[in-house]
């Protein structure tokens, strides 16, 4: 049985999920990576407000957390692709729900502003 009254991230499913959601760019990165293997420069183009250093850091963290895999091809120039890992694939349903909620929330905010 999960312990919902703990600070141990790996004992509480809410805290474990919160760690995935906590990175500023994690949700957007996972959204773009879920579409299929993607290269670093393509991610950087899609997220034009993120610096290369921050993108590198966030990708390393997602890889360390086991949510994405990094495949390096032995060629010149170097080619690296990122894709969702097996456990990262499980996060797809969460991303769909986030998108659904986000759309509803945007409409809610717009309707409140027009009142």
Specify the residue positions occupied by each region the protein language model found.
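Amphipathic alpha-helical dimerization/coiled-coil segments
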Residues: 2, 31, 89-115
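Residues within the DNA-recognition helix of helix-turn-helix
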Residues: 58
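N-terminal intrinsically disordered/low-complexity leader segments
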Residues: 1-9
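Basic, amphipathic "hinge/linker" alpha-helix immediately C-terminal to the N-terminal HTH DNA-binding motif
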Residues: 74-98
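Alpha-helical DNA-recognition elements
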Residues: 61
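N-terminal helix-turn-helix DNA-binding core of bacterial DNA-binding proteins
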Residues: 8-54, 75, 81, 112
